Amino acid sequence: MRRREFIKLSASASALGLLPSEIGKTLEALNGSVNCDTTNRRLVLIELKGGNDGLNTIIPMDNYSYYKNSLRPDIHIPVNSSNYNSLVVDSSLSGSLQDLAFNPALLIGNNQGFKGLYNAGMLRIMQSVGYPSQNKSHFASIDLWATGNDGNSWDNGKESGWMGRFMENAYAEVFPTNYPFAIQMGSNNTWLGFHAEHEHGLALNIEGQNSENFYTILSGLAGQAPTNIPNTHHGDEINYIVQTDAFSNTYANSIETAYNNGSNYNDSAYYPDTDLSNQLKTVARLIRGGIETKIFLVTIGGFDTHNNQNQSNNDINGRHTELIKELSGAVDAFVSDINSDSIGDDIVGLTFSEFGRKAKQNNNRGTDHGEIAPMFVFGKPVKGGISGNNVDLNEANSNNNWQIQTVQYDYRQVFSTLMQDFLGANDSVIDKTFFDH
């Protein structure tokens, strides 16, 4: 794979048949990232667990009448002459195939949330992200995203995750370390994406801001290691736990030190009191405190909105809106925090979800499992803008169960480009991470 601009098509990706439109324009990308020192760079991944409704997150205005009257008469996001100017993503694109409006909830935050990030040139909207042969099971699709596979390559290295493979190949020369290469927050279940083929990082579930809990949680993992581990899949899982346990006390010390040395900028004014906000606040504090962890994964759940997506017909308030508000407020505060000093120069964040929702509402004021969904990439190093055209709503019909299936960007292109162009991975590492495993 040759190094390209952000999400430029690689030789390996071409072999997968991925030919998305406008690929050459996408985040040319990470401003000034190429050939620069990558030592302090970090990725912050935000998982929108449950399958986010992309159509009600960023609204396609080029076919709004069909969206409102035919597909979603009861749960559409109202956009009209009175609020269009405040919700439009980019007024210079009005009337084009990239004419989008933000869900009003994405304006939540001291700096107007995602709208403020876009206006400041720090938000890239990736349209129609997915993978070939989309699986609509939560568990299966989450595992496919975690292992770097798609619906056609289910068994291709499914015992390890792309994050784990990336870390053990990119940082082999410095392993082991006294800090985890990746930290997970907001979920009791360790994400499969952290599982490597040989070495293992440490995923943590950290809630709130109690520094004393860090050492207790980690050191509490210690115990007598089992012997006579079988050479089976079950044995591999035991080995993973044993290796993680071996590093737990060392990791506990480094995390405790970083947390105590770190701080948040004016957190009382910027951070809402929400679970996602507390996770991101902890990430910022650990980074400012000197932790050298490369990848952070935080989670917000509840996006499986089969019913009561809004409170009543034609009312935007409801389950989905509250989730988007939490996302916008937390990211707004996090970006304000990290940009209060120089650490924001080396941090890129992005959102992802295991799949999207159907284009047509169901009979319960909700939406059922779909396929493609947008991703948001944000931070100072990001070149703002929109990648890809609006979804073609006419693609969804009764013959395909109201699905929008055209993938403009494969999720592996997004992640592999960040690994290469931002974290500095070479061709060999990228191929071992996503294609040769």
How would you describe each model-predicted region?
Residues 49-54, 130-134, 187-192, 302-305, ...:
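Solvent-exposed loop/turn segments at secondary-structure junctions
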Residues 1-14:
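N-terminal secretory signal peptides and thylakoid transit peptides that target proteins
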Residues 39-43, 119-124, 178-179, 291-295, ...:
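Loop/turn elements at helix/coil->beta-strand transitions in domains of secreted/extracellular proteins
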